[in-house]
């Protein structure tokens, strides 16, 4: 009872990442699909530091771990895990205090311990470790393997030392790799070796352009190779004379400043602030300079937390913002719904065609609202019949855009582009920035995105493009419609049908039934 009450009190403060609405899912999926031909180091999404956003700074127990599922189900693409190496116990753990420290169980036989370390108090569950998080990630990977919500997860690790060094080595010390490969199939992990193979086979890129030292594109990893995870050791804050040898994990993890160069900065960087507030004077050279930097991250600090404006500015300029403090539900919801660089506010407008929109409904006011235009760094649902200028990409230099001087409806957009260009859509935030510089403020142009083939399935490829998810989407939606109440109704109908065809045994033996009725009629006791 004590443990249950303790966990209940903790969970009052659990931060719940809001689930995706249908509109959120459609928006997120269309942005992902448009980015399929983009190298994975140029992808932009919100990141979450688990130790500060999900866990309390001093509490590591199961109720908080359950909140990781919310992040994964919402397809959050970047997760930062603080891992602690117990120098005395030779093991990795999530708890910032060594279990060999001054320990007090909260109840007899409990795995939840009160620990005192470095003049701080911690509450930690012994059962909660790195494998606990990796297992949740694996469960998400398996659940979404055949789903339209397929996504890539980049796991960043920040390493710390705790405890007193033990002069006596052990035969099998812990490693970061062991819990990862025991939880997630290694074929689903991009490793330094598999990246090198891709580079040698000339299948790596920088953005949309071939680069022998670049990274695979998103579509190849997800669709062709089934890779779902990129593990990166981002920060090494361990003792200088630590007993842990980082090279043990170099075959599985990318290591910052060794096998990978992550561009990491924080909100206190005034140079970055100047960069991310520049929109009107943005140049192709600005985009090209940032493209040379891989996995661009910006971490908020206690002194300079994200505002909603700075958060969205970083996303628009190609940086993945990492949430790194405690939030209330209202704040976290604002950041969650503004995480996309494409459809602003993460929502498709209410006038959008539903996911299962009836294409034959001639009375629908939304029947022509099936095409997308671009304005003020945002995709906007528009009527396909409206005349607009057209966004055309240079065939030789992918960051160069041309906007037609003549107007066209969506159906004629492909033919409207001049020689040497083609009708296309911005596929990264930096791509959007270079297109925006060609468009007058508050004006809009056609981009190659529509839902003409199937309501809610936003695809590029012109007006004749076919939705690859139509059948899958229908099936998944019908499964969602089959709610528990529907299941109960079906079971009740089955019981009624079963009783209709199967007679109860007592009615089959009519002779015995009549004898039983006669016996009941006999008086029992003294007649009055």
UniProtKB/Swiss-Prot annotation:
Glycans are attached at residues 37, 73, 202, 257, 278, 281, 328, 366, 376, 394, 442. Residues 15-480 are extracellular. It is a single-pass type I membrane protein. One of its GO terms (cellular component) is membrane. Pfam families: TIM-barrel_MTC6. Residues 1-14 form the signal peptide. Keywords: Glycoprotein, Membrane, Signal, Transmembrane, Transmembrane helix. It is found in: Membrane. Residues 502-528 are cytoplasmic. InterPro entries: Telomere_Capping_Maintenance. The chain crosses the membrane at residues 481-501. PANTHER family: MAINTENANCE OF TELOMERE CAPPING PROTEIN 6, MAINTENANCE OF TELOMOERE CAPPING. Belongs to the MTC6 family. May be involved in telomere capping. This is Maintenance of telomere capping protein 6. The gene is MTC6.
């Amino acid at each position: 009872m004590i443990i249950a009450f303790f966990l209940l009190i903790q969970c009052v403060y659990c931060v719940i990442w809001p689930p995706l609405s249908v509109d959120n899912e459609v928006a997120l999926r269309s942005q992902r699909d448009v980015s399929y031909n983009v190298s994975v180091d140029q992808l932009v999404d919100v990141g979450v530091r688990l130790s500060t956003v999900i866990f309390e700074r001093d509490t590591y127990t199961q109720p908080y771990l359950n909140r990781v599922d919310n992040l994964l189900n919402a397809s959050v693409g970047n997760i930062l895990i603080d891992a602690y190496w117990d120098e005395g116990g030779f093991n990795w753990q999530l708890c910032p205090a060594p279990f060999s420290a001054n320990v007090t169980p909260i109840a007899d036989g409990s795995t939840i311990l009160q620990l005192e370390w470095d003049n701080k108090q911690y509450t930690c569950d012994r059962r909660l470790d790195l494998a606990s998080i990796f297992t949740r990630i694996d469960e998400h990977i398996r659940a979404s393997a055949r789903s339209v919500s397929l996504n890539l997860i980049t796991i960043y690790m920040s390493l710390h030392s705790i405890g007193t060094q033990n002069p006596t080595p052990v035969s099998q010390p812990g490693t970061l790799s062991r819990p990862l490969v025991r939880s997630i199939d290694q074929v689903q992990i991009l490793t330094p070796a598999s990246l090198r193979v891709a580079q040698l086979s000339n299948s790596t890129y920088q953005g949309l352009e071939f680069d022998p030292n670049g990274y695979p594109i998103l579509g190849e990893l997800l669709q062709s190779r089934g890779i779902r995870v990129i593990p990166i050791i981002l920060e090494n804050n361990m003792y200088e004379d630590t007993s842990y040898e980082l090279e043990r994990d170099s075959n599985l993890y990318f290591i910052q400043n060794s096998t990978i160069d992550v561009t990491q900065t924080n909100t206190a960087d005034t140079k970055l602030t100047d960069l991310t507030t520049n929109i009107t004077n943005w140049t192709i050279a600005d985009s090209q300079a940032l493209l040379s930097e891989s996995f661009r991250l910006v971490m908020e600090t206690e002194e300079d937390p994200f505002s909603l404006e700075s958060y969205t500015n970083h996303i628009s300029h190609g940086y993945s913002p990492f949430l790194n403090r405690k939030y209330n539900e209202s704040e976290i919801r604002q950041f969650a719904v503004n995480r996309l660089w494409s459809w602003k506010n993460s929502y498709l407008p209410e006038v959008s065609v539903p996911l299962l929109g009836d294409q034959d409904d001639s009375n629908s006011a939304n029947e022509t609202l099936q095409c997308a235009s671009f304005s003020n760094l945002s995709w906007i649902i528009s009527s396909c019949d409206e005349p607009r200028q057209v966004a055309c990409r240079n065939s030789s230099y992918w960051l160069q855009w041309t906007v037609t001087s003549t107007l066209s409806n969506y159906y004629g957009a492909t033919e409207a582009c001049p020689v040497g260009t083609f009708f296309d859509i911005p596929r990264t935030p930096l791509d959007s920035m270079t297109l925006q510089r060609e468009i007058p403020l508050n004006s809009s142009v056609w981009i190659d995105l529509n839902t003409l083939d199937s309501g809610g399935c936003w695809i590029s490829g012109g007006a004749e493009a076919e939705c690859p998810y139509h059948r899958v989407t229908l099936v998944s939606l019908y499964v969602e419609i089959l709610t528990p109440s529907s299941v109960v109704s079906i079971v009740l109908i089955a019981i009624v049908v079963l009783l209709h065809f199967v007679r109860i045994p007592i009615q089959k033996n009519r002779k015995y039934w009549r004898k039983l009725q006669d016996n009941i009629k006999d008086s029992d006791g003294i007649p009055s």
